[in-house]
């Protein structure tokens, strides 16, 4: 109960400091001290439970609140800040972040140079970083202070061996000296005091004593877990109830030991008068509305399936928002109608502007009878001698006005400012002609609309007709930008109709792009609850829409930095497959959704909690959420839908995995039936490919040589003797037009075939393809014909195509070429067995690739393609309206003088305020991406060269005097996070 109360106090306290409610300076200082002490104590409990990640969150929150207090001229005791740094260093060290642990240890020593624990943490961190000489110096000081501590002794011996020093035997003083109390003022007593000052026996433990001498600050209260600190302050954050009274002061009996005298007693009595007397003349409103909108349980306005238990997005940031947010830039959110709307950029984390609907939505949760313009409503005459509850407890809270539940905050619509959307059906939006785009909207038609068609139009477009937005094509592995259909551009009829995977108009491109990024869900545009009905969401439907599988992975490995993929082994399923750690798999497993296409994507599905919000985190979508598991929002659409599924069905994670296995067993059965009928040749396409073909060595082909394998099919016949494997060979086809060999790549997707294969626009123009991934457009007419032949005959493997050609042209020589039995068949539908090889190793979520060893991982994170992924994404082309920043973040001098800029798009300065604002926003996004990549250890710690992106990461002060040669000069500059 005591810990639950402390958690509630922390939650309320964090919400209170994010508001702008007034408070006396003395009470405010004591309130901040109590909040930091609670965070310190909660972090200690989590550390003892070995939940180091959450303990780190509490310590960081406590230090963040301390920084916020310092910015408000409130100084907290240095002893408490020192212990926070020491314990946070312990968390960092346990998690393997030795640089961070060293930094915190040095900060703690800056606050208290005599802190032995801080010195010990520093020594251990230096030891792990390979700085053994410095570590030995720190360890020696610890050994002199605590010569009998096992942890100190062990560390000293380890460092001595590494430095090649001789470990001498320690001197023991005669025991008779202690027996006859001859060491009353000697070192023995001092050692005992230091070793057990916090109630623990080893210096390797964390600091736990958070009691602070009240003489260090005139407005500080002693830390006692049983005495509530300013209940009238914390109660401002809870719904008012007429039955609530001020807690009694029975817990003061704890001070009956008579140890409080002098100034301590005066300070204690002053603080008690504050608690008992309430806020005399303070800013406590007589009728204060709730700061957090809460739906009454069981309201009939919500669907009966979900009831009133779905939490609503709060206008206040979550409890741990200060973890990644500057305290001086906190967003003050309240239901008081005197608030002005926030500016376009509130903080680097709030780069997505708040829409007007988010602020207006607060008005529907009840009206306020007073405002900041009426200071009299905030004054309440109270008698400091009366033990009566505050005025808010005497009067019942005003009942909220009857209104519809405000679910506007659940609607994630990033296109609200530029697009309009409407629902329709076949009756009000019928097809009026034979062509693909012949539809007309009948406005004002009286009928019962099914609302199963999404219509949209651009607000700024001259064409204000409603256009149908088809469902996004998901049966394709294409990951590039969407393009308009060539037939629709030429105002011709598209022969593929609704099956065309190209967009029919710009509105369709915009919606599809946002849907793929995860920032828009058409099901939530008009129904925030997503039309949740019993049976509408099933695991089979989720897997059919999102592909992939659900499985369990080791959560400790998955959350580690860098991310490690491991699951239970067959030999010992109770232990994870990470041989270096061998975590208990049953106690640390987590549900993960895995999709394997051109890359690997792992989406962690957290266990649904009541305080979670049914919305996708905007930070995760844009550059990765730094709060990770402590975030209250979903980090993917698949996680959001699983939460909805759990909300109404009560399914557990084990049930989800079992349903996933059943679904794939059914798919395997269907795939087996389909494969049995693939033996006969198809009647709708040619049975063989007429062009001459052969396999050659891929490495030799890149050097311009056509080299076939040897007779044993183990090596190529060149002098280099390259290994002959499926991955290192290339299929060549003789071009009749060019009369030379042309390489043919494997099918870009073996799961979903497009209607037709088109030539790559770069290859058509005789240029090299600029696409980073596996381009799904053919790079030659021969490649297009080969892919079309394979699609029509349901041939999924290049080897199978070659075997069919070889059988026709060399029927009497079946032994020539690569034998049919050596091919590795591929299945049209990926089964769970296809994921067996991706269940272990390091994982890079930026590139979607796994590495099997540390060496391979280091090579990957140092590659240029990987660094490019840190700063780019598939949505960059459609997410920005202006040029890429050219080097200088200021307006062009020529344009400011009204002259034309001769450099045009090559000008290094911005051509307008809007372009400059976008450049500044883009720089902040890139900084956040870099911070996320560094936090996840996707970059080498000392890697500070990012090529053309270096000038974007300079500080504002450096940019003010930037010269036109800034990008070149910045090639060796250190990036700033």
Curated annotation (Swiss-Prot):
Keywords: Host-virus interaction, Metal-binding, Nucleus, Phosphoprotein, Repeat, TPR repeat, Zinc, Zinc-finger. Its main location: nucleus. The keyword Mitochondrion does not apply. It is found in: Nucleus. The keyword Cell membrane does not apply. PROSITE patterns: TPR, TPR_REGION, ZF_C3H1. It holds the Pfam family TPR_8. GO terms for biological process: miRNA processing; post-transcriptional regulation of gene expression. InterPro entries: TPR-like_helical_dom_sf (IPR011990), TPR_rpt (IPR019734), ZC3H7A/B (IPR039691), Znf_C2H2_sf (IPR036236), Znf_CCCH (IPR000571), Znf_CCCH_sf (IPR036855). A motif (LD motif) lies at residues 248-256. GO terms for molecular function: miRNA binding; RNA binding; zinc ion binding. GO terms for cellular component: nucleus. A zinc finger (C2H2-type) spans 842-866. Residues 365-403 are annotated as: Disordered. The modification Phosphoserine is found at residues 217, 364, 367. A zinc finger (C3H1-type) spans 484-508, 616-638, 754-782, 886-914. SUPFAM superfamilies: beta-beta-alpha zinc fingers, CCCH zinc finger, TPR-like. TPR repeats lie at residues 1-27, 36-69, 82-115. May be a specific regulator of miRNA biogenesis. Binds to microRNAs MIR7-1, MIR16-2 and MIR29A hairpins recognizing the 'ATA(A/T)' motif in the apical loop. (Microbial infection) Interacts (via LD motif) with rotavirus A NSP3 (via the coiled-coil region). This is Zinc finger CCCH domain-containing protein 7B. The gene is ZC3H7B.
């Amino acid at each position: 109960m005591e810990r639950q109360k402390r958690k509630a106090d922390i939650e309320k306290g964090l919400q209170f400091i994010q508001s702008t409610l007034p408070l006396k300076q003395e009470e405010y200082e004591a309130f901040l001290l109590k909040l930091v002490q609670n965070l310190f104590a909660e972090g200690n409990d989590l550390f003892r439970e070995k939940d180091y990640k959450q303990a780190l969150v509490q310590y960081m929150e406590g230090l963040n609140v301390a920084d916020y207090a310092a910015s408000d001229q409130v100084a907290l005791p240095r002893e408490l800040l020192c212990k926070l740094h020491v314990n946070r260093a312990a968390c960092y060290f346990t998690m393997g972040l030795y640089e961070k642990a060293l930094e915190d240890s040095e900060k703690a020593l800056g606050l208290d140079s005599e802190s032995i624990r801080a010195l010990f943490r520093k020594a251990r961190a230096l030891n792990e970083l390979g700085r053994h000489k410095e570590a030995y110096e720190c360890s020696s000081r610890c050994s002199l202070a605590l010569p009998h501590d096992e942890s100190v002794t062990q560390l000293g011996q380890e460092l001595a061996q590494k430095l090649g020093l001789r470990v001498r035997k320690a001197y023991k003083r005669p025991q008779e000296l202690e027996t006859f109390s001859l060491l009353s003022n000697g070192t023995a007593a001092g050692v005992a005091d230091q070793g057990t000052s916090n109630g623990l026996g080893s210096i390797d433990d964390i600091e736990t004593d958070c009691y602070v001498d009240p003489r260090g600050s005139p407005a500080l209260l002693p830390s006692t877990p049983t005495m509530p600190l300013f209940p009238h302050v914390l109660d401002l954050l809870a719904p008012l109830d007429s039955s609530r009274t001020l807690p009694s002061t029975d817990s003061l009996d704890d001070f009956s030991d008579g140890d409080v005298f002098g100034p301590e007693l005066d300070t204690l009595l002053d603080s008690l008068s504050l608690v008992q007397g309430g806020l005399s003349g303070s800013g406590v409103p007589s009728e204060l509305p709730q700061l957090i909108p809460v739906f009454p349980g069981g309201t009939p306005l919500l669907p009966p399936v979900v009831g009133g238990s779905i939490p609503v997005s709060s206008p206040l940031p979550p409890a741990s928002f200060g973890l990644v947010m500057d305290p001086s830039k906190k967003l003050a959110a309240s239901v008081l109608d005197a608030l002005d709307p926030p500016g376009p950029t509130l903080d680097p984390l709030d780069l997505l502007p708040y829409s007007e609907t988010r602020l207006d939505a607060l008005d529907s949760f009840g009206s306020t009878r007073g405002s900041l313009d009426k200071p009299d409503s905030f004054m309440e005459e109270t008698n400091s001698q009366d033990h009566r509850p505050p005025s808010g407890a005497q009067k019942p809270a005003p009942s909220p006005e009857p209104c519809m539940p405000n679910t506007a905050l659940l609607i994630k619509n990033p296109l609200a400012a530029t697009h309009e959307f409407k629902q329709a059906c076949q009756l009000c939006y019928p097809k009026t002609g034979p062509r693909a785009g012949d539809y007309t909207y009948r406005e004002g038609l009286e009928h019962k609309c099914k609302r199963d068609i999404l219509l949209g139009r651009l607000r700024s477009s001259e064409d204000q007709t409603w256009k149908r937005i088809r469902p996004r094509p998901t049966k394709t592995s294409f990951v590039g930008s969407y393009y308009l259909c060539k037939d629709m551009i030429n105002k011709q009829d598209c022969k593929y109709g609704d099956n065309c995977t190209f967009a029919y108009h710009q509105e369709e491109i915009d919606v599809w792009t946002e849907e793929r990024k995860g920032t828009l869900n058409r099901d939530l545009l008009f129904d925030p609850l997503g039309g949740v009905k019993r049976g509408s969401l099933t695991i089979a439907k989720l897997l059919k829409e999102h592909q992939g599988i659900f499985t369990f992975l080791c959560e400790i490995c998955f959350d580690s930095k860098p991310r490690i993929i491991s699951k239970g082994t067959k030999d010992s399923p109770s232990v994870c497959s990470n041989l270096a750690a061998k975590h208990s798999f049953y106690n640390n497993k987590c549900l993960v959704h895995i999709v394997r296409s051109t890359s690997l994507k792992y989406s962690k599905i957290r266990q649904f909690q009541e305080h979670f919000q049914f919305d996708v985190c905007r930070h995760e979508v844009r550059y990765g959420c730094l709060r990770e598991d402590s975030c209250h929002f979903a980090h993917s659409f698949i996680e959001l839908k699983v939460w909805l599924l759990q909300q109404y069905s009560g399914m557990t994670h084990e049930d989800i995995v079992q349903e996933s296995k059943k679904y794939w067993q059914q798919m395997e059965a269907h795939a087996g039936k389909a494969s049995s009928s693939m033996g006969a040749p198809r009647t709708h396409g040619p049975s063989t490919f007429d062009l001459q073909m052969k396999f050659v060595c891929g490495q030799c082909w890149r050097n311009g040589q056509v080299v076939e394998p040897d007779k044993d099919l183990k090596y190529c016949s060149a002098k280099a003797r390259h290994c002959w494997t499926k991955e290192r060979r290339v299929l060549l086809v003789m071009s009749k037009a060019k009369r030379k060999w042309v390489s043919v790549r494997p099918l870009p997707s073996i799961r979903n075939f497009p209607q037709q294969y088109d030539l790559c626009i770069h290859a058509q123009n005789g240029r090299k393809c600029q696409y980073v991934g596996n381009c799904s457009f053919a790079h030659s007419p021969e490649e297009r014909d080969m892919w079309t032949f394979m699609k029509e005959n349901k041939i999924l493997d290049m080897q199978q195509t070659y075997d069919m050609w070889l059988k026709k042209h060399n029927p009497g020589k079946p032994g020539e070429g690569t034998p049919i039995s050596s091919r590795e068949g591929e299945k049209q539908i990926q089964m769970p067995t296809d994921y067996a090889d991706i269940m272990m190793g390091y994982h890079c979520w930026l590139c979607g690739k796994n590495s099997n060893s540390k060496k391979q991982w280091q090579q990957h994170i140092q590659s240029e393609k990987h660094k490019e992924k840190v700063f780019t994404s598939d949505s960059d082309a459609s997410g920005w309206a202006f040029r890429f920043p050219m080097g200088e973040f200021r307006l062009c001098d020529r344009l400011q003088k009204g002259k034309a800029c001769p450099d045009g798009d090559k000008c290094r300065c911005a051509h307008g305020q809007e372009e400059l604002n976008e450049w500044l926003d883009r720089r902040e996004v890139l900084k956040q991406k870099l911070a996320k990549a560094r936090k996840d250890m996707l970059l080498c710690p000392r890697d500070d060269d990012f090529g053309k992106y270096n000038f974007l990461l300079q500080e504002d002060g450096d940019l003010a005097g930037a010269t036109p040669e800034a990008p070149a000069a910045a090639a060796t500059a250190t990036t700033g996070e």
